[in-house]
């Protein structure tokens, strides 16, 4: 749907920008600018209609580019609107612009136009880099309930947690291969995927190049997945089957003991499944005396309802860190945190901003990441 929204919004944004640019540009440049806007809109409208018939790299680039232009156009429009708000305020207060000479007024319009163009291209570059160059966030967490008072931890386990890969038109096989290498470079004992490994269609995940990359994920204690809300959007059974075909283990309201070791891993189905098990039913199967208990759940909507259940570490994704500023404000309002870690009682909650992005490889105000957790007990 993000592609449809992009085209529809540009239908309203482009005329406004064309009108404002026409107040700055000469007749010839004005026609060129309008022609460029019309050409972009027509090409992306055609691409929207036919893109599902052409599952090719060039079509993915076209669709990805359309979303880039849409979001960067929004930021550029915000600059233009902001300038006009300042003019409105000035006209009713200081009247600096109103009383200025025509040459000064025209110069101010040119500066505003250049500023909007600068914001347009700058947000494109920033949006691209924030996805394409993920950061590695290292965390250390000691399970204090398993360490006698005054003693030092004796055991260590390294978990690598990633979420929101969103395999689709935007997340290319090349990027996925680099993401897999980044994960493997951390030398994990256990690899965990927190859902939304599919964006909107399973066909892209079944690309042989993508499957080859994901099959190369390996750790001594295994690779485990949970479902996110996007897996429910199209062909759930194909998405479930894909996990086993790339060598992963899917947890749906179930518990595993990776490598038959001390760690208890709880994998919860996503909240969009209204028939998922109550958490207390799943938690009854956990053995907190065995070792650390880790809960992996895609959406952090219900983490505050876990209560006194024996969970030491909660790993979630879903938020993308807001992905597009000021989306962070809505995420914070909904979940109480955007991304990162925070203590909740005797446990720690981690919300990852994710290693991919939805719709397009575009992030402003956040960055893609993987989380490396060194557990001590």
Per-range role (PLM):
Residues 1-132:
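Non-catalytic terminal accessory segments
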Residues 1-6, 129-141, 204-210:
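Short N-terminal secondary-structure initiator segments
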Residues 119-146, 169-174:
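Hydrophobic alpha-helical transmembrane segments in integral membrane proteins
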Residues 142-377:
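Soluble catalytic domains of enzymes that build or remodel membrane lipids, polysaccharides, and related
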């Amino acid at each position: 749907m993000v592609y449809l929204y992009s085209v529809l919004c540009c239908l309203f944004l482009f005329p406004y920008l064309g009108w404002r640019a026409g107040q700055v540009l000469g007749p010839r440049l004005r026609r060129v600018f309008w022609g460029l806007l019309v050409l972009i809109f027509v090409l992306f409208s055609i691409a929207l209609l036919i893109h599902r018939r052409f599952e090719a790299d060039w079509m993915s680039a076209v669709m990805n580019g359309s979303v880039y232009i849409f979001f960067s156009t929004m930021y550029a429009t915000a600059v233009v609107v902001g300038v006009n708000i300042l003019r409105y305020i000035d006209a009713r207060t200081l009247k600096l612009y109103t009383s200025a000479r025509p040459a000064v007024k025209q110069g101010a319009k040119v500066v505003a136009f250049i500023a909007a163009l600068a914001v347009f291209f700058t947000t494109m570059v920033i949006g691209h880099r924030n996805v394409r160059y993920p950061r590695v966030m290292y965390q250390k967490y000691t399970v204090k309930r398993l360490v006698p008072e005054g003693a030092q931890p004796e055991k260590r386990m390294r978990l690598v947690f990633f979420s929101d890969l969103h395999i689709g038109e935007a997340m290319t096989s090349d990027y996925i291969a680099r993401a897999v290498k980044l994960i493997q470079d951390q030398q994990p004992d256990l690899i965990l995927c927190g859902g939304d490994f599919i964006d909107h269609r399973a066909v892209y995940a079944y690309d042989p190049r993508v499957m080859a990359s994901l099959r190369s994920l390996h750790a001594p204690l295994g690779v485990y997945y949970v479902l996110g809300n996007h897996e429910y959007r199209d062909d759930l059974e194909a998405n479930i089957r894909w996990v086993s075909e790339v060598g992963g283990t899917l947890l749906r309201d179930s518990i595993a003991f990776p490598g038959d070791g001390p760690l208890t891993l709880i994998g919860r189905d996503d909240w969009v499944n209204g028939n998922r098990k109550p958490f207390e039913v799943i938690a009854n199967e956990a053995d907190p005396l065995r070792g650390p208990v880790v809960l992996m759940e895609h959406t952090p909507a219900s983490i505050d309802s876990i209560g006194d259940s024996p969970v030491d570490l909660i790993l979630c994704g879903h938020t993308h860190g807001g992905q597009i500023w000021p989306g962070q404000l809505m995420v914070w309002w909904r979940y109480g945190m955007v991304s990162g870690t925070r203590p909740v009682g005797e446990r720690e909650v981690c919300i990852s901003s994710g290693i991919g992005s939805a719709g397009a490889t575009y992030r402003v105000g956040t960055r893609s990441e993987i989380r490396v957790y060194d557990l001590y007990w």
